Amino acid sequence: MGDLRVACIGAGYFAQFHYQAWAQISGVDLIASVDMDMSKARATGLAAYDNTEVMLRDAAPDIVDIITPPQTHFDLIKLALQSDVRAIICQKPFCRDLDEARRAADLARSAGVPLIIHENFRFQPWYRAIKQVLDEGGIGAVQQVTFRLRPGDGQGATAYLDRQPYFQKMKRFLVHETAVHWIDTFRYLLGDPASVFADLRRLNPVIAGEDAGYILFAWPDERRALFDGNRHLDHGAKNTRCTMGEALIEGTGGTLTLAGDGSVALRKFGAAAGTVIHGAEDWQGFGGDCVKALQTHVIAGLIDGAPFENMAHEYLHVLEIEEAVYRSAASKSWEPVSGTV
């Protein structure tokens, strides 16, 4: 089998991490870039297009990597499914809303083409290390998890303009764009929650959506997880965007602490100090090279038949939880997660 041919749709800010990662993965031939701004597509050094349909016809990729805003996803997925692709990867937030995401997932399932959502935080090396400890029972029975989001990029009239200016116009922001990462990560670590409670705030008046809030997740066995997010505030790290914050995973037998440099320490119950079980590294890519880790995972699935994480139909559970969060913020009460997807 020859190298798998990959084409990327989108060449905006975050797309750079996708292109860089694909270029480092063996068994991959990165062949084309599509963007409405042809100059951005050309800047990648690949065959450049401003028309996805033409690219699919001329380049004939095996994998299409969609790195565009949510309102474009459904039409691009539909176009890709009409060509002879072996897999589609789609960035999050996935589609405009849950209904559109369901329709996209159904189309891919009917076509027999894997549609994998590029939700990469669960692939960050510190969460993989934490998951291994939990699976091995290293901190006993987990009772609670806390993540404090503190990227420090949300203050003032110029917030987000240097990287992703469309953030300012999103009517649903903190949860839909950012906290959704931890909705999926909490699912990865603890399974699907049964209900949620949310208190959301908009602190920066120049943006349309919420930029701070608390989200409490509950499981039937009395486990709890707390997402405590505030994009105005920072945390003690040289790069506040490495982990985006700090976490505690607490169990009856010990506590795991995630620091802002990506290191994870384990303190056994009753001990005064902990031991670093996952050290910080000088990761070159975003978030501990999680983009590359996800892409490598997809390649392994296509070549070796390894099961895919983040298949679109499974990821719909994340969107259902997100909807419950917004319902809770509006009702100011606990909201059940329906589990109907």
Predicted ranges, named:
Residues 1-44:
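N-terminal Rossmann-like dinucleotide-binding module
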Residues 1-3, 63-66, 220, 297-341:
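C-terminal helix-rich "cap/oligomerization" subdomain common to oxidoreductases
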Residues 121-207, 332:
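Predominantly a Rossmann-like dinucleotide-binding segment in NAD(P)-dependent oxidoreductases
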Residues 36, 283-296:
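Active-site loop of classical SDR/Rossmann-like NAD(P)-dependent oxidoreductases
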Residues 58, 62-69, 74-122, 137:
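Beta-strand-loop-alpha-helix segment that lines the small-molecule cofactor/substrate pocket
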Residues 183-263, 292-304:
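Contiguous beta-strand/loop segments that form the cofactor/metal-binding neighborhood of enzyme cores
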Residues 46-52:
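Conserved SAM-binding strand-loop segment of SAM-dependent methyltransferases
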Residues 28-30, 85, 142, 193:
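Core-facing hydrophobic residues within beta-strands of well-ordered domains
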